[in-house]
Amino acid sequence: INRLIRCKIRRIGVFKVGRFFAEAESFENLGGWVVDQQSMNIMGSSYIMAHGLGSPVANAVTHIKLPESGKWYAYVRTRDWTAVWKRGTPAGTFKLMIDDVGFENTLGTNGEEWDWQYAGAMELEGGKTLRMSLRDLTGFNGRCDAVFLTTDKNDIPKNTEEFRREVSGVTAEEDETLYDMVVCGGGIAGTCMALAAVREGINVCLIQDRPVLGGCNSSEIK
């Protein structure tokens, strides 16, 4: 086995003039929001969820600096997780805020599939530290994957893997290391297999799509 792809990921920050991207799970303070990894293999990242059992949770907060002043258009990748039951009113809704001022549109109302929802537009000052936050409105599991800001009203984010890699700063490199064995999955079986092989002097690559090892016996399962 002599060819593997290694990814480098930048989670939050400006990557192009007139654009800004932030992963929700990389906010400095998640407040009452929690990180959920259940769709990581589909989405390419975790997302955060406002699990308040019907009571709005504390805001998730981070601080940003935009590259220029002007009118910024905001999009949030989210979904209405209750839309599949056609109940009429989305259960988990929230607002995107800058310095405690909310964009005009309520989020989490855009259908059952993950997609970019337009939050609204706002005049923002470049080069100044701004407080960006997610304000939960219901406490019923509103979901937020990422935030995208742009000064171009025609720069509408695409719900594609290619766009996601571009804005998240993901680059792929060939790993020139030669491996004797590749183990896919860091559950109990995969972790034990990889450790046993290493102890026998085998050069092993363990591939895992979770932040911790252990599978159903990991700290993710509570």
Where would I find each of the regions flagged by the language model?
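Extracytoplasmic
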Residues: 1-173
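Beta1/beta-strand and adjacent pyrophosphate-binding region of the FAD-binding site
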Residues: 175-187
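N-terminal Rossmann-fold NAD(P) dinucleotide-binding loop
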Residues: 190
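Aromatic pocket-lining residues of Rossmann-like dinucleotide-binding sites
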Residues: 197
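Conserved dinucleotide-binding and phosphotransfer motif residues
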Residues: 200
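Short beta-strand "acidic-cap" motif of Rossmann-like dinucleotide-binding folds
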Residues: 203-208
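Conserved N-terminal glycine-rich FAD pyrophosphate-binding loop of Rossmann-like flavoproteins
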Residues: 211-222
